Regions:
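Catalytic Tyr-X3-Lys loop
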Residues: 101-120, 161
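C-terminal helical subdomain
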Residues: 174-181, 190-229
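Catalytic loop of short-chain dehydrogenase/reductase
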Residues: 135-160, 165-170
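The beta1-alpha1 cofactor-binding region of Rossmann-like NAD(H)/NADP(H)-dependent oxidoreductases
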Residues: 38, 57-72
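Amphipathic alpha-helical dimer-interface segment in Rossmann-like NAD(P)H-dependent oxidoreductases
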Residues: 72, 76, 112-134, 170
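Conserved glycine-rich Rossmann-like NAD(P)H-binding loop of the short-chain dehydrogenase/reductase
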Residues: 26-42
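Conserved mid-core segment of classical short-chain dehydrogenase/reductases
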Residues: 91-109, 150
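Conserved glycine-rich cofactor-binding loop
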Residues: 12-13
Length: 229
């Protein structure tokens, strides 16, 4: 995978960090994006010594100019981008205990700016630099499709992100899809599967999933397990 370039937003922890490690371990050049410079430095140290090259880049997906420079940097290093994982996300509140009517306007705005507009910005700014066979993956969860009490505007923002994937799938030549790994233990959830256990799922979707099955659809754990059993 020496000639394979991956851009992961929200790469400093959780799913993003595990996905970055998986691809770097196989020799890909992984460009890791995050807002926290200290966390990026820790990530670089953690991934140092793996087979692939790792580049860390501070960027905020809420800022299209940051993301534009991120994609320019990734492409300048290796020529083009083979995989984009639009993983950056936030949750303001306690999962399962965030009623819509009790959320602040600030939380509403930031959920949408980060979790939905951030996906839009990441895809749009990556397009000029994508390799012909490049893929775009957007992590999500069932809360985006099966609204449950207590997930507030976070659920709304993830539903919006999935709608964006459907829209892009209708217009782009590149395979783009939603990856739903189930409940994963992250800073957002605090409980669930180890991110390292689901990172191979992202690798499979990126490299082995038939492109016709990555046309705006949701690829969940069941699909992955059936395909790899």
């Amino acid at each position: 995978m020496k000639e394979y370039t991956v851009v992961v937003t929200g790469a400093t922890r959780g799913i993003g960090g595990a996905v970055a490690r998986t691809f770097a371990a196989e020799g890909a050049h992984v460009v890791c994006c995050g807002r926290d410079a200290d966390a990026l430095a820790e990530l670089a140290t953690d991934l140092d010594g793996l087979e692939g090259d790792v580049t860390t880049h501070r960027a905020d997906v809420r800022d299209e100019f940051d993301v534009e420079f991120l994609m320019e940097t990734a492409a300048r290093i290796t020529g083009d981008i083979d995989l984009v994982v639009a993983n950056a996300g936030v949750y303001h509140g306690d999962p399962g205990h965030t009623p819509l009517a009790e959320e602040s306007y600030a939380a509403f705005d930031d959920h949408l700016r980060t979790n939905a507009r951030g996906v839009f910005t990441t895809v749009v700014e990556a397009l000029p630099y994508l390799a012909p066979e490049a893929r775009i993956l957007v992590p999500s969860g069932s809360v985006a499709r099966e609204f449950k009490p207590g997930y507030g505007t976070y659920a709304i923002s993830k539903s919006t992100a999935e709608a964006l994937v459907h829209g892009f799938a209708a217009e782009l030549d590149h395979p783009i899809g939603i990856v739903d790994p189930g409940v994963v233990e992250t800073d957002l959830t605090g409980t669930g599967r180890d991110p390292a256990d689901v990172a191979p799922m992202f690798r499979w979707v990126a490299l082995e999933c038939p492109p016709e099955d990555l046309n705006g659809q949701v690829v969940d754990l069941t699909v992955w397990k059936q395909a790899t059993r």
